Design a protein with these regions (language model features):
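Positively charged n-region of N-terminal signal peptides that target proteins for export
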Residues: 1-5
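Sec/Tat signal peptide C-region and signal peptidase I cleavage site
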Residues: 18-24
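Beta-strand-enriched cores of mature, soluble protein domains
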Residues: 24-207
Length: 207
């Protein structure tokens, strides 16, 4: 009986002294996403499927239109992700961001971009160029460049896909790569006529 009493007291003490769980960071972002990969059109990965070309090689631009991480404003922040899907990624943050924004993006990567963060080989600041219009998208970083054109459908309007099963792929507009290139010590590729898209990404914490 005494042993049970002492055990109960011990458990109670542990419960009382256990440190509180850290609160989830407060964050939210709305971003324009532009990507080209090596899959044929339209990339099945965006529907929750498997790539139709392995390895899937891609470049994704994330341009944050509005958002924050805790008290840091992220509006205007952009970064480029070069990736070999599920294997590795190299992330280039626009060199115009502040030191505080850089820290915020680095903290946000494992939360909002966990897939890219898991295989991250490098996270560096670098010059990034981007030119996004309704008919043409061009963006580049130190080792990668993408040039893609919109695909027209019925009535000459852009081909769009609604309600894809991922918050990063809303307002999805279909593009086709004109030139999609990467050259580094890790890999080299050059694709044309492959999948491309622009979309809106909106994500945030629950608090």
């Amino acid at each position: 009986m005494m042993r049970k009493l002492f055990a109960g007291i011990a458990i109670g003490c542990l419960t009382l002294t256990a440190p509180p769980r850290a609160a989830e960071p407060n964050w939210h972002l709305v971003a324009t996403v532009a990507e080209s990969c090596s899959c044929t059109i339209s990339c099945p990965c965006n529907f929750g499927g498997e790539p139709n070309r392995n390895p899937c090689e891609g470049n994704r631009l994330i341009a944050i239109k509005s958002g924050h991480y805790e008290t840091t404003d992220l509006a205007g922040v952009s970064f480029l992700v070069t990736f070999n899907m599920r294997n590795w990624s190299k992330i280039y943050l626009n060199d115009k961001v502040s030191a505080q924004q850089e820290k915020a993006v680095e903290a946000l990567l494992p939360i909002a971009f966990a897939g890219f963060h898991r295989g991250m080989l490098s996270f560096t600041k670098a010059p990034i160029t981007m030119d996004i219009t309704e008919k043409r998208v061009r963006f580049s970083g130190p080792e990668s460049s993408v040039d893609m054109e919109v695909m027209s459908g019925f009535g000459g309007k852009p081909v769009q896909i609604k309600n894809l099963p991922n918050p990063a792929y809303q307002d999805y507009t279909q593009y086709k790569s004109v030139a999609h290139k990467h050259a580094s010590d890790k890999a080299t590729w050059s694709h044309s006529g492959t999948n491309g898209f622009t979309s809106t990404m909106e994500l945030g914490s629950k608090n």
